[in-house]
Swiss-Prot record:
Gene3D superfamilies associated with the record: 2.40.50.100, 2.40.50.150, 3.90.1100.10, DNA-directed RNA polymerase, beta subunit, external 1 domain, DNA-directed RNA polymerase, subunit 2, domain 6, RNA polymerase alpha subunit dimerisation domain, RNA polymerase Rpb2, domain 2
Recorded coiled-coil stretches: none
Source domain of life: Eukaryota
Protein name per the record: DNA-directed RNA polymerase subunit beta
InterPro entries: DNA-dir_RNA_pol_bsu_ext_1_sf, DNA-dir_RNA_pol_su2, DNA-dir_RNAP_su2_dom, DNA-dir_RNAP_su2_hyb_sf, RNA_pol_bsu_bac, RNA_pol_bsu_CS, RNA_pol_Rpb2_2, RNA_pol_Rpb2_2_sf
Principal place of residence: plastid
UniProt keywords, alphabetically: Chloroplast, DNA-directed RNA polymerase, Nucleotidyltransferase, Plastid, Transcription, Transferase
Record-stated family: Belongs to the RNA polymerase beta chain family.
Name of a matching Pfam family: RNA_pol_Rpb2_3
Function summary: DNA-dependent RNA polymerase catalyzes the transcription of DNA into RNA using the four ribonucleoside triphosphates as substrates.
Species of the source: Nasturtium officinale
Subcellular location as annotated: Plastid, Chloroplast
EC number: 2.7.7.6
Length: 1072
């Protein structure tokens, strides 16, 4: 992709690679590690022994294809087989069998898993790395208090702190702390060993009193003292085995298991050489940590930055899947133990096959993919969304932070993120800074650290081949890294001058000769979303963040179009998303249609099925269109069919349309957008959406539910689309209220509702007459469209627990309309306020009307000037029939490089097309345009151009909602909230202020009382409004006021009001 001939080339890694590598690591290493931990299981009499032979494990190829798993709502998984042996110790016989342990969901070519027919993805999590961290805080007297925190592999914490008298304590809970001597003795060290292994024995001896000596006189005493302090137990506990086990479980297992990474980190931080396989905290670690803490007190050593990436680790797909396998095998162990003891009790001869069940493993993985916070439904709005979702990094999840507790420091950008985590792409709202995105070239290293690549520069040897290094966050602190992008550095223009560089978390300017490493690619620091923004260096970071989020919300259009101005990454994003169909080897096309492409190659005939109107989980339409003709020869890797939002194998999320930046009668006030009717009639922004409606049939206590066309008491026109089975026919056009599936649920009627002849039959013959209630699937409001698919999924077994499911898929064609949201690639978003006839739109000097009018006031205050560059360059590109791919930070080549490029291209376009208005030197980039209604020119020249505009998934059809009557909340008796609950609007604070401002007291009182939550009065209001007349005044209070009174009563406050008589000033007390 980059680099010149002397250096070799550097290619961008596959965007799904991080998921593939994680899953491969689990299959290759994690599976064997967990199986090898499975213990030998013996019966009570030690006569039978069961064990697994993990060397011979086998994963079988899935029985179904990916597409069938999605269609039939099944899990795309592989069966795991392991050899197991049962040994009879008395006779020394062994029975070995190959047994089925369970199903493990597999990863497909998109880096996702299919569980119960749904695409799911596992997010990578960032956790605090296990190890020891030294920090200092100021106490209430302003004196520094030094602490050392030991974090275990499970996330448990053990704090060491040093007080004014230089005594060292281990804090075991928020309130309890114990002497470090007691802790070391409880872990197995005696006083002589403690004093031999520390650098400051005199400090340890200084706080050793006679009472303390007695406590640590023996290991048993130390354990009892530690247990008393840890569990806050009074009296004198007696030393026992159970007490040791409790302490082991509650304290040592949770807070002292360091794991492989924790052992490495503690060895490195405290200069120890304890073997890597020793994964538990030892007395030596505690004493070395205490020594280091004393050194900190005396001003030696450095404090740790908890937010530095070297102190974080990535919990990848491999770790999460391995944890789940360990959990499943521990459950399996309990099952095997129970089965062995049961077999011996009933005097049965067990076999390995009988002892093992596949349920623990299968259910553990299904519940993990279905319920774990880091396992999410894959967002498939468009191809970009699919890829970006798999590259997310989350601080949230089990063992991590929460949106409420995370402080500003954790959310902020850190210098160590440079080249590893994108400084721009994060979610908005409560999780800002907690969910990040991987930089393009970043990868996960062996120890769970994020690594970034750099080119190593050798002194005086410019001709030598330059080496590429992947550095972890702890390594790159020792190098001077040139911050300039590699394209500029390749040109040799930096060799004489100073360059910006990064060294030990600081950004400096140094001479070129002092540089050790340099970046390999201009986009190295950004994620995929941010790398698709052209001229990103001219935008404010907040707007770039919005843009990278909004590109993921773009709807695939019916006729997509490549962007004129791009960044060059569009092709790789499209290819890695798996949306286009690609030839796996060369051959010749034999046949193509909308459903498949058949081609011959290597002596075989291959058929590639194409995706036809597939629904994504955001209701967008995924569809493939063939791009090759019959008889054509193709090469390996060639695009055979374009998918949704791709054109020619490149990402195409929007359209290049003619835009003017000018005010127009106030219709683009506050970011509103004015558009031409051409965009509607020309199907420029038309998209297809597929909605799924489903219904289940159950077996009730009165009998099974029936799918039928014979539905009593319903109008015939509502049933007109049903076939003989009672299911809607393919290709039907359905409107709101139409029946999609006819269903009857049996129920027993009340005695009073029986007809006289029914009662007679029951009395004479004892026949139970049953009636049925219609529970049909009806098309809800806003669901009109064409039925494109009907699926009847019958689960195996067909019991009441496995109901039959009928799914109906309806396609909608949505043109752009008032209320839809559109956005550019620079965070410039807006809602469509008016659709103007084309003759009323402002038009250019060559007579072309513009397609869209944006508000120019949206640019200066938001500082996203990149849109102006893109707009003007897009106009030049459309006139010259050229496409531009621009790398960021081109100011590195020379000053004002972007502006010079845009102006030079506009000048070329004006000369080539003989249109002088395209580039006018008095106001370059602007042009005089005319009012379509009058034909008069506007006073000021206006910026016109062709930016790339996207239509977003926030569409008015999904948002608009009205309510005439509906449900009320039981407590407040006010309408429910939200479209999904058929809710209504509430007269809130601001509405009350508005009405107060106009002084309409009676209307306000009606709105707040009678019409809102007065149960009787609101029905009377409706009647009097229809008939005419005065609204009767209710005697009692509205429901929300009564609620207030009750809440006050719960606080023991009684609310009463008094009436004072004018005549004799007598107080008549009345209870509310």
């Amino acid at each position: 992709m980059l680099g010149d001939g002397k250096e070799g080339t550097s290619t961008i890694p596959g965007f799904n690679q991080i998921q593939f590598e994680g899953f491969y690591r689990f299959i290759d290493q994690g599976l064997i590690e967990e199986l090898s931990k499975f213990p030998k299981i013996e019966d009570i009499d030690h006569e039978i022994e069961f064990q697994l032979f993990m060397e011979t494990y086998q994963l079988v190829e899935p029985l179904i294809k990916e597409r069938d798993a999605v269609y039939e709502s099944l899990t795309y998984s592989s069966e795991l087989y392991v050899s197991a042996g049962l040994i009879w110790k008395t006779s020394r016989n062994m029975q070995e069998q190959r047994i089925f342990i369970g199903n493990i969901p597999l990863m497909n070519s998109l880096g996702t898993s299919i569980v119960n027919g749904i695409y799911r993805i596992v997010i990578n999590q960032i956790l605090q790395s296990p190890g020891i961290y030294y920090q200092s805080e100021l106490d209430h007297n302003g004196i520094s208090v030094y602490t050392g925190t030991i974090i275990s592999d499970w996330g448990g914490r053990l704090e060491l702190e040093i007080d004014k008298k230089a005594r060292i304590w281990a804090r075991v809970s928020r309130k309890q702390k114990i002497s470090i001597l007691v802790l070391s003795s409880a872990m197995g060290s005696n006083l002589r060993e403690i004093l031999e292994n520390v650098c400051y024995p005199e400090i340890f001896l200084s706080f050793l009193t006679d009472k303390e000596k007695k406590k640590i006189g023996s290991k048993e005493n130390a354990i009892l003292e530690f247990y008393q302090q840890f569990s806050c137990v009074g009296g004198d506990p007696i030393f026992s085995e159970s007490l040791c086990k409790e302490l082991q479980k509650k304290f040592f297992h949770q807070r002292c298991e360091l794991g492989r990474i924790g052992r490495r980190n503690i060895n490195w931080r405290l200069n120890l050489n304890i073997p890597q396989n020793n994964i538990f905290l030892l007395p030596r670690d505690i004493l070395a940590a205490a020594d280091h803490l004393i050194g900190m007190k005396f001003g030696m050593g450095t404090l740790d930055d908890m937010n530095h990436l070297k102190n974080k680790r990535i919990r990848s797909v491999a770790d999460l899947l391995q944890d789940q396998l360990g959990l499943a095998l521990s459950r399996l162990e309990n099952v095997v133990k129970g089965t062995i003891s049961g077999a011996i009790r009933h005097k049965l001869i067990p076999t390995p096959q009988n002892l093992v069940t596949s349920t623990p493993l299968t259910t553990t993985y299904e519940s993990f993919f279905g319920l774990h916070p880091l396992s999410q439904v894959l967002d498939r709005t468009n191809p970009l969304t699919q890829i970006v979702h798999g590259r997310k990094l989350s601080y949230l999840g089990p063992g991590g932070l929460t949106g409420r507790t995370a402080n500003f420091r954790i959310r902020d950008i850190h210098p160590s993120h440079y080249g590893r985590i994108c400084p721009i792409d994060t979610s908005e709202g409560i999780n800002v800074g907690l969910i990040g995105s991987l930089s393009i070239h970043a990868r996960i290293g062996d120890w769970g650290s994020l690594e970034s690549p750099f080119y190593e520069l050798f002194e005086k040897s410019k001709k030598a081949r330059i080496r590429m290094l992947f550095l972890s966050p702890s390594q790159d602190e020792y190098f001077m890294i040139a911050a300039g992008n590699s394209l500029a550095l390749n040109r040799g223009i930096q060799e004489e001058q100073a360059v910006p560089a990064r060294y030990r978390q600081e950004f400096l300017t140094i001479a070129w000769e002092e540089v050790h490493l340099r970046s390999i690619f201009p986009f190295q620091y950004f994620s995929i979303g941010a790398s698709l923004i052209p001229f990103i260096e001219h935008n404010d970071a907040n707007r770039a963040l919005m843009s990278s989020n909004m590109q993921r919300q773009a709807v695939p259009l019916s006729r997509s179009e490549k962007c004129i101005v791009g960044t060059g990454l569009e092709r790789q994003v499209a290819l890695d998303s798996g949306v286009p169909a690609i030839a796996e080897h060369e051959g010749k096309i034999l046949y193509t249609d909308t459903e498949k492409i058949v081609f011959s190659g290597n002596g075989d005939t291959l058929s590639i099925p194409l995706i036809m109107y597939e629904r994504s989980n955001k209701n967008t339409c995924m569809h493939q269109k063939p791009q090759v003709r019959r008889g054509k020869c193709i090469k390996k890797g060639q695009i055979l069919a374009d998918g949704a939002a791709t054109v020619g194998g490149e990402l195409a999320l929007g359209k290049n349309i003619l835009v003017a930046y000018m005010p127009w009668e106030g219709y683009n006030f506050e970011d509103a957008v004015l558009i031409s009717e051409c965009l509607v009639y020309g199907d420029i922004y038309t998209s297809f959406h597929i909605r799924k409606y489903e219904i289940q049939t159950h077996v009730t206590t009165q009998g099974p539910e029936r799918i039928t066309k014979e539905i009593p008491h319903l109008e015939g026109r509502l049933l007109r689309h049903l076939d003989k089975n009672g299911i809607v026919m393919l290709g039907s056009w359905v409107e709101t209220g139409d029946i999609l599936v006819g269903k009857l649920t049996p129920q027993v009627a009340k005695e009073s509702s029986y007809a006289p002849e029914d009662r007679l039959l029951r009395a004479i013959l004892g026949i139970q007459v049953s009636t049925s209630k219609e529970t049909c699937l009806k098309l809800p409001i806003g669901g009109r469209g064409r039925v494109i698919d009907v699926r009847w999924v019958q689960k195996k077994g067909g019991s009441s627990y496995n109901p039959e499911i009928i799914r109906v898929y309806i396609s909608q064609k949505r043109e752009i309309k008032v209320g839809d949201k559109v956005a550019g690639r620079h965070g410039n978003k807006g809602i469509i306020s008016k659709i103007l006839p084309r003759q009323d739109m402002p038009y250019l000097q060559d007579g072309r009307p513009v397609d869209m009018v944006f508000n120019p006031l949206g640019v200066p205050s938001r500082m996203n000037v990149g849109q102006i560059f893109e707009c003007s360059l897009g106009l030049a590109g459309s006139l010259l029939d050229r496409h531009y791919r621009i790398a960021p930070f081109d100011e590195r080549y020379e000053q004002e490089a972007s502006r010079k490029l845009v102006f030079s291209e506009l000048y070329k376009a004006s000369k080539q097309t003989a249109n002088p208005w395209v580039f006018e030197p008095e106001y370059p980039g602007k042009s005089r345009i005319f009012d379509g209604r009058t034909g008069d020119p506007f006073e000021q020249p206006v910026i016109i151009g062709k930016p790339y505009i996207l239509k977003l998934i926030h569409q008015v059809d999904d948002k608009i909602h009205g309510r005439s009557s509906g449900h009320y909340a039981l407590v407040t008796q006010q309408p429910l909230r939200g479209r999904s609950k058929q809710g209504g609007q509430r007269v809130g604070e601001m509405e009350v202020w508005a009405l107060e401002g106009f002084g309409v007291a009676h209307i306000l009182q009606e709105m707040l009382t009678y019409k809102s939550d007065h149960i009787r009065a609101r029905q009377e209001v409706l009647g009097t409004t229809i008939i005419g007349g005065t609204i009767p005044k209710p005697e009692d209070a509205p429901e929300s006021f009564r609620l207030l009174v009750r809440e006050l009563r719960s606080l023991a406050l009684e609310l009463n009001h008094f009436l004072v008589s004018e005549k004799n000033f007598q107080i008549n007390r009345k209870e509310v």
